[in-house]
Amino acid sequence: MPEPGPRMNGFSLGELCWLFCCPPCPSRIAAKLAFLPPEPTYTVLAPEQRGPGAPAPASAASTSSASAAAQPAPQQPEEGGAGPGACSLHLSERADWQYSQRELDAVEVFFSRTARDNRLGCMFVRCAPSSRYTLLFSHGNAVDLGQMCSFYIGLGSRINCNIFSYDYSGYGVSSGKPSEKNLYADIDAAWQALRTRYGVSPENIILYGQSIGTVPTVDLASRYECAAVILHSPLMSGLRVAFPDTRKTYCFDAFPSIDKISKVTSPVLVIHGTEDEVIDFSHGLAMYERCPRAVEPLWVEGAGHNDIELYAQYLERLKQFISHELPNS
């Protein structure tokens, strides 16, 4: 990143050159604006890596583990030569696991493969076995599945939904590099894995995107109908985040969700904090106004970008939406 200099709309002139000229293509601009993959907080081991004589995780004190017990369909073998339903999850201390081994044993992990030939780390959390709905959760830009695992268990148990999630290319155990094209290929692979491996039909899938995760969520929802869509702190487009005065989508813009949201035919709940310091509240408002099937939104007064979940109305609104406002609730 260049040294600070004179600033324009929150960016120095040096930063503007770095952003748009090295090289000036949407995928590179997108990567510079949006992707902050952390050091992986977990590993996924195949059966042969856990057999006699195989190396153990770093230490019992620094890791927790869960066996992935799901039995997938025969046509969905594990990537990397592992047998179906046999991988195990090992979390590092940085994953900040908040539950017992019993809850961790309910977490299933496996690999899928994207159309762009990246290996995709996937996670299925059985929070509510009798629940009708499963959330396909696309997380934010600076976390991985290990860090999100505890949150998924807490959220799913409170809203009575199972949760399926995945790491973007270049995040966690997923191969490749983060990019806009990979985002779309990643969620396509996750959607197909949820449907074929677990037999979840589209009318029982709720797409949930948070922050950068709203980008693949909107893209998928504009192409497939599902039970519902939840957009948590969405962005209109990459340029509109960097330059708030942008009024139209340019050819070199990235993540143009504002141009896709009108094609979403499923019910959409938009959630945004009024004091969001990363993606301005105006983004959530614009997405809500452009969405043809938007339900009553949740504007969390005083909330920022990373603390909406701490407000009581967050869970209350999710429960109301899922339990009472969906067509087949």
Swiss-Prot record:
Signal peptide: none annotated. InterPro entries: AB_hydrolase_fold (IPR029058), Hydrolase_4 (IPR022742). It is a lipid-anchor. One of its GO terms (biological process) is negative regulation of protein localization to microtubule. Keywords: Cell membrane, Cell projection, Endosome, Hydrolase, Lipoprotein, Membrane, Palmitate, Postsynaptic cell membrane, Synapse. One of its GO terms (molecular function) is palmitoyl-(protein) hydrolase activity. The active site is at S211 (charge relay system), D276 (charge relay system), H305 (charge relay system). It comes from the Eukaryota. One of its GO terms (cellular component) is endosome membrane. It catalyses: S-hexadecanoyl-L-cysteinyl-[protein] + H2O = L-cysteinyl-[protein] + hexadecanoate + H(+). Its main location: membrane. The keyword Lipoprotein applies. The keyword Membrane applies. Hydrolyzes fatty acids from S-acylated cysteine residues in proteins. Has depalmitoylating activity towards NRAS and DLG4/PSD95. This is Alpha/beta hydrolase domain-containing protein 17C. It comes from Bos taurus (Bovine). The gene is ABHD17C.
